[in-house]
Design a protein with these regions (language model features):
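Bacterial Sec-dependent N-terminal signal peptides
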Residues: 1-39
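C-terminal soluble interaction/assembly domains
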Residues: 229-295
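Acidic/His-rich structured neighborhood in mature extracellular/periplasmic domains
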Residues: 75-206, 226, 250, 259-262
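Residues that form generic nucleotide/phosphate-binding pockets
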Residues: 48-51, 67-71, 125, 129, ...
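Cationic-aromatic interfacial patches
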Residues: 36-103
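Mature, folded catalytic cores of secreted/periplasmic enzymes
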Residues: 44-50, 59-65, 111, 191, ...
Length: 295
């Protein structure tokens, strides 16, 4: 009987200990989320949820487009991910650059499709999208080059690269702007070890097979580009793979470009069609088209 009594207390202690660990885990997660989201972000997220809570049954592309449209009029803010000296997950719903606009719209859409949009789910989705293998492990783990972002998010099953099927042609990206001009990047200044790691990534990008649709052929592909497709504009600038990113939207059967343009402007939809918009940029070479996949 005494042995049974001791066993009971041992089991009871272990259960209490396990419950305490679980409780502390959730408390810690709550604290970390609170640090990531400021009060303004929380207000924006609650408003977004209220306006989009009945979209889970819709096609993922349509939900991405709706998420993007929610941010029309939001201020462009540069370097939103370069806060502090250490790499951490940044959520900024009130100021976006072109990349964070695209990533945030995709992350919100995936969370909606999963039927669980809250602060922690958004953090999880952004981490999965923004970092190599979905793991935040320092500055180099962030997918800085869009071409690298494409490869990794295709591998993770988050998007499909449909560029080739839309008439895309082979392109080689000699991406090296980060290693050649580290002084332009706050976290790379005077850090040769980090620059060497970036070089390794750049060399990998050069070896991969990529496709893009040249500017002259975009109009022919527009009908097959869907609402919510992610658009990456390839570059003629030496060392740069992609100039700009955004989201395709449809109006009256035509395709337009929704994006966060240069500093001083706001998230908007192009007045001209996608092909006309891209051809208007002297340094634009073509586009890659990435199709969001159902989570």
């Amino acid at each position: 009987m005494r042995a049974q009594f001791q066993l009971y207390h041992q089991m009871s202690f272990k259960m209490k200990k396990a419950s305490l660990i679980i409780f502390l885990f959730f408390v810690l997660a709550e604290m970390l989320t609170a640090q990531i989201f400021n009060e303004k972000d929380k207000i924006v997220l609650r408003d977004f949820i209220n306006k989009n809570e009945n979209t889970a049954s819709e096609d993922i592309g349509e939900v991405v487009a709706k998420a993007g449209k929610y941010f029309i009029g939001t201020e462009y803010v540069a370097h939103t991910l370069e806060v502090g000296d250490e790499e951490k997950l940044i959520v900024n719903l009130s100021g976006l650059d072109c990349t964070t606009f695209m990533e945030t719209s995709l992350a919100l859409a995936r969370a909606l499709k999963k039927g669980k949009l809250d602060e922690q789910t958004l953090v999880n989705e952004l981490t999965a999208i923004r970092y190599r293998g979905g793991v935040l492990d320092g500055y180099v783990s962030r997918l800085h080059y869009t071409s690298d972002w494409v490869t990794d998010n295709v591998k993770k099953g988050i998007v499909a690269d449909v560029t080739k099927s839309l008439g895309g042609e082979r392109i080689v990206f000699n991406a090296n702007i980060m290693s050649e001009k580290p002084e332009l990047y706050k976290r790379l200044k005077n850090k040769p070890a980090l620059v060497e790691k970036i070089k390794e990534i750049e060399n990998s990008i050069k070896q991969r097979e990529y496709y893009h649709i040249p500017v002259s052929k975009i109009e022919q592909a527009e009908d097959r580009i869907k609402a919510g497709d992610l658009i990456a504009i390839t570059s003629t600038i030496s060392g740069v793979d992609v100039n700009h990113v955004g989201i395709a939207v449809k109006r009256n059967g035509k395709t337009y470009f929704m994006h966060a343009p240069m500093a001083g402007k706001k998230v908007q939809i192009s007045e001209s069609t996608l092909g006309d918009y891209i051809s208007g940029g002297r340094k634009n070479k073509g586009i890659m088209v990435l199709r969001p996949l159902e989570p």
